[in-house]
């Protein structure tokens, strides 16, 4: 996809995005013309300064048919047997990191080649840098003497007034700039102090677009149907705006039986930005799998930061550390690891929406390890139950639904990666009332305001339907609202082939499906019970004494007594009250649930505290049955 195609993707894309996109190719074309001229110059190898081509080179360097030379006075050193011209400099936004120089040559078989030489790598491992240049066809010599002059040449190039490329650590929006890196394609109107935008490392090949936006829209319009697929499209687009909207990572997990089309939902969502083919069918397919190591999955997520990530088959993940992995995934940061020298490695980070699939929900997966969804994760890890009928049109048979799904699977391996680019290009082309292009801060405020309006709209409709949302559910609703905002804009801009009302209906269906799934909602009482259970298991021996043992040592932090016959735990009411208070729960609420599950012995119906019938002991207790220590809270409550 080139700059001319960019503005033809959708109406309203500003011409400045075309112009920025063309800068690198125009610059390299300019350098190529210098190379073509230099390679035809016959220079005197004993005195290259007399006839050699110095255009585009640092002082004292010359190109000619015999290659690249350094010459100063009587000192003449051949740096390369092929001509070399520096194209551009690269560095990070603070102009202190990721410094490198792009060098162009005409290699031994006549092909023009550009290689970026990292100053850091040159200092750490010059032999590896030279080997890479040689492998690409640069005629650089491996002699130690000449190598020193090559290093000086590269450092001299870094001081030249060459075009400056901004190195982005990851894809996505550039902080403070109306610029976005999508794969290796910059979508920008301009960047202060820089001429172009490049990735820190080569983007995954499946992110490069295939087909056309018109072709993709036809496939989606004819074959995509139902709220899960439309919601996947909206959340995939919303993922690109997380930073501007002031939000962090969200995981939308689609779960259901084996014939509900979960994987197709991921394919539809991924096709917005990258190869949406069947997982495992081609090396370029961008859908990840849960069946991998934590480290590998975290690294893969970082490679899709700024776009969207899709992970298939949660059931294939079999490590008992799922709770820890889920925490890392939704926090956007990998576990801190050390390198061979015991120094901290550079943190692996990501920020995007993650679409996931599996036959069980996130809470069910946690429950299989006797864990449960924590309060801080409910608004980040959202399980959405999908049913076979969700993808069916009215009156459509099962065979017809399957046929459309098969068509999607096949076509999305050919048509992908254009809608996301068109959406961002159109987003960056928005104008103020006076016709001026919106700045980064104005775009950020606009998407925040739009998301707030969408959130209020969703909340009002839910309230009219009788839903009462908790604070955590309100936070999750903002994530759905961003999906509505992004999907609505894409529909209005004719990037999604659906009416805005269809987008709204799909988001509202997703919200209702989530709220109606009571078993998979965060339960603060269950969290309090888990904490109490863990506290009792770990520390009961140090804080409880037998009820009838008059000679037993009484600990300073005394929690209560053990029943002489049943070994039940008779917990002092103030101790139990304090545990519940730490989790913002009332003691009666927790005790009632324990009693209902037959894990608490009440004094009488509705009265959960008991007084010990022992003249030597005073106080009020909650009698927790011994069996509570071994129950599966996630499954039983």
Where does each model-flagged region fall?
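Conserved Walker
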Residues: 333-349, 365-371
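Phosphate-sensing "switch" segment of ASCE/P-loop ATPases
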Residues: 348, 370-490
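Loop/turn-to-beta-strand initiation segments
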Residues: 305-308, 350-354
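DNA transaction DNA-binding modules
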Residues: 164-223, 434-637
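AAA+/P-loop NTPase substrate/partner-engagement loops
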Residues: 265-310, 314-320
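Structural recognition of the conserved hydrophobic beta-strand(s) that form the central parallel beta-sheet
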Residues: 351-359, 383-384
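Conserved glycine-centered beta->alpha loop in an early N-terminal alpha/beta scaffold
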Residues: 2-224, 299-300, 304-307, 367, ...
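P-loop NTPase catalytic core of nucleic-acid-dependent motor ATPases
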Residues: 190-281, 480
